Each structure stands twice: as structure tokens, then as C-alpha cells.
Amino acid sequence: MEPVKMTNSSDDFTQSAEPFKLFAEWLADAAKSEPNDPNAVALATVDPDGLPNVRMVLLKDFDETGFVFYTNYESKKGQEILSAEKAAMCFHWKSLRRQVRVRGPVEKVSDAEADAYYASRPRGSRIGAWASKQSRPLESRFALEKAVAEYTAKYAIGDIPRPPYWSGFRIRPVSIEFWHDRPFRLHDRVLFTRPTPEGDWNKDRLYP
């Protein structure tokens, strides 16, 4: 039997020495090829009983300190993160046949960071942050629309302040895994790990 022949990648990511530059390159590739929301990511948290929850959020910033997203701290995910102080993310770009998994402790972003991002949002989204009691029971669509109308009237003139319960989280990764599809399920996997968010990265290539 002849050995399985594998196609080569145009850019051999398995040679990358650190994860953040590689992630930036992959995200830029996704921005060119994904039809919708290349920064969409599945965010996993756990409740007090250890039962996991997962939902899609949007990555809003990243650098060598971590991956940032924003939410209502009083929402279910906000409460679970504040309790566990840990989370995981999974990016999947179907058009590129690539995946990135991120795990680590979570910290709040600074008020200055949250204020700057909140101010950049469309006015309607800022109103929505006040009107929505995220994750709580909603009696009807009309009740939500009424709340939106009330806050629209309240902030009809001038700036809209950021709600005290609305801010961001930063996952400070201790594990980042890159996955690329290959024929016959002989995929490429590279795992970067470090003992703490301040530590040096160790790199391992993994069996598919």
C-alpha cells in the first residue's frame, strides 16, 4: 500500500514560535474569506454546579495580554465568569478550514477601555445596553420595545453614559491551540501552553 500523501500549506504555521502573531495572521485571513463576522467566537463558561454553557460572542480586541469581549455583567455568562474567573473560546473559520481554541483565567477590562469601546458603538446599541435586562425573563417583545423607547427619550440629547453593569472581560490565555484541516483527517495541530499568563510559551505539535 502506498503511503498517504498530504498537501502542504502555503504558510507552514507549525513553525511559528509564538501564538499571537499567528492568530493575527489567521484573523486577517478570516476577514478576507468569511462572509459574516470573522471575529465571532464560541465562548464557554461553567455554572456553579460545573455545568457548561456556550454561546457566540464577538471578539473586540486582542493583544499579547489577551482576548477581549464585552457583555452585561449581570447576564448569565457575566455571572458565571465573575464566579469561576475562567473561560474558554473557540474560533472556527469554515471557509479556511481552521480553528483556534483559547483557555485561561479572565479579568475585567479597565473602565477606560470599556468607556472607549462603549462610546464607539452605534447609538442604538448603547440604548440597548440600558434597555435589555440580559438573560432575565421577558414578558413580551413590546416590553423590550417600551424600555428602548423610554431610554431613547431619556438620552435624547447628549452623550449616553455606559451602564455600570456593562463592561468587558479579557481572557488571559495559558493555552492556545491552532488546528488546520488536512486530507484523510491527518490534521495539523499546534498547542502553545504556559503555566501562567505571565509565563513563557511552550510549543507542542499534536497528533490529529
From Swiss-Prot:
Main EC class the enzyme belongs to: oxidoreductase
Catalysed reactions, as listed in the record: pyridoxamine 5'-phosphate + O2 + H2O = pyridoxal 5'-phosphate + H2O2 + NH4(+); pyridoxine 5'-phosphate + O2 = pyridoxal 5'-phosphate + H2O2
Lineage top rank: taxon: Bacteria
Gene Ontology molecular function: FMN binding; pyridoxamine phosphate oxidase activity
Gene that encodes the chain: pdxH
Entry cofactors: FMN
UniProt cofactor note: Binds 1 FMN per subunit.
Family membership noted in the UniProt record: Belongs to the pyridoxamine 5'-phosphate oxidase family.
Any Pfam family: PNP_phzG_C
Entry function: Catalyzes the oxidation of either pyridoxine 5'-phosphate (PNP) or pyridoxamine 5'-phosphate (PMP) into pyridoxal 5'-phosphate (PLP).
Residues binding FMN, per UniProt: 55-60, 70-71, 76-77, 99, 134-135, 179, 189
EC assignment: 1.4.3.5
Keyword terms, alphabetized: Flavoprotein, FMN, Oxidoreductase, Pyridoxine biosynthesis
Binding site for substrate: K60, Y117, R121, S125, R185, L186, H187
GO biological process, one term: pyridoxine biosynthetic process
Keyword GTP-binding among UniProt keywords: no
Biological pathway: Cofactor metabolism; pyridoxal 5'-phosphate salvage; pyridoxal 5'-phosphate from pyridoxamine 5'-phosphate: step 1/1; Cofactor metabolism; pyridoxal 5'-phosphate salvage; pyridoxal 5'-phosphate from pyridoxine 5'-phosphate: step 1/1
Protein name: Pyridoxine/pyridoxamine 5'-phosphate oxidase
Species: Brucella abortus (strain 2308)
NCBIfam families tied to this protein: pdxH (TIGR00558), PRK05679.1 (NF004231)
Subunit-level organization: Homodimer.
